[in-house]
Amino acid sequence: MGFVKSMLALSLGLSAMGVMPAPACTRVMYKGLDSIVLTARSMDWKENIGTDLWIFPRGMRRNGEAGEHSLEWRSKYGSVIASAYNIATADGMNEKGLVANLLWLAESEFPVRDRMRPGLSISLWAQYVLDNFATVSEAVEALAQEPFALVSSYIPNMPDKFATLHLSLSDPTGDNAIFEYIGGRLVIHHDPSYRVMTNSPVFEQQLALNAYWSEIGGTTMLPGTNRAADRFVRASFYTQAIPVTDDVQLATAAIFSVIRNCSVPLGISTPGQPNISSTIWRVVANQRDRVYFFESVLSPNVFWVDLRDVDFSSDAPVCRLKLTGGQIYAGNAAADFEVSEPFVFEGV
């Protein structure tokens, strides 16, 4: 019993590090049989972030939106993404099955901008990866060279706060990588076993916390609060506990159940803990079959976009699936996208 109490104290101590105004997202990856790989995430935020889904074709010209000497590139791969405020890419999957998830990390400290490197606004961080890489290994090799200076900007409706985020990547082989800026330095965690990410504390400390709870065993006791460290432990346990199957329908249902278990009820508020934010949507990306599932907490059903039904050719238009008006979709919504001008990424 003394051991359990000590582990609980450690969990509460590390969880308390995350008490600050921030969203409480969770990301998990599942690897099943017959090459099934699924990545799920929740988006938790204190208000509606005006998310729409977008189709971006190959060949789009991009600008890093970081002022003078911004990074420029042309997209190599097409992608389906979920926007935030229609000024940033928060989540998405490209046509090669590479998935990018942006989550909050209050401990992020970005370096003073190096003017020798082209700048990249944080609103484009995930999109840059989706545009340019097919695998996690490719992205890790390229980003480790720090080809750009990442520049943060203010959050809509929070004019006194900069965006502090970390980035997770996964691909159809089951590989994973986490990118964080800690103390002004880029830290990359790259290993297929890194299947779970939440918010605070930094990823290295999350791994240590999870190792302690693994000694207890999830069938004995699991931390049950909405804090990031507790959600990390629960997501890790349940991702390992659900069936390893070759039935993609069962696997999808199972990983949805895990991400729902880590979600925060709509409308909940915790006095003194503004970081405990309600879950507003959830995503599951089937990377083997290139299917992007989306679930709004305000919608009666899950719908999906089958990327195999999307035209990503360089002469195809940008298309948008409007969600901000409370629209309801069912089944494969690939045909419901409408041609649209692309949104403008937030710059600095």
What spans do the regions from the language model cover?
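Positively charged n-region of N-terminal signal peptides that target proteins for export
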Residues: M1-S6
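Bacterial N-terminal signal peptides
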Residues: M7-G18
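C-terminus-biased signal that marks the final domain/tail of proteins
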Residues: P23-L38, R62, V151-S153, N157, ...
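A contiguous strand-loop segment
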Residues: P23-R117, L150, A330, D336
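Short, surface-exposed beta-strand-loop junctions and turns on beta-sheet-rich folds
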Residues: W45-E47, A106-S108, G184-L186, L298-V302
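A short, polar/proline- and glycine-enriched secondary-structure boundary/capping micro-motif
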Residues: N48-L53, F110-D114, I188-P192, F303-D309
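Acidic/His-rich structured neighborhood in mature extracellular/periplasmic domains
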Residues: K96-S123, L143-V202
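Proteins synthesized as precursors that undergo proteolytic processing into mature forms
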Residues: G119-S152, V248-S257
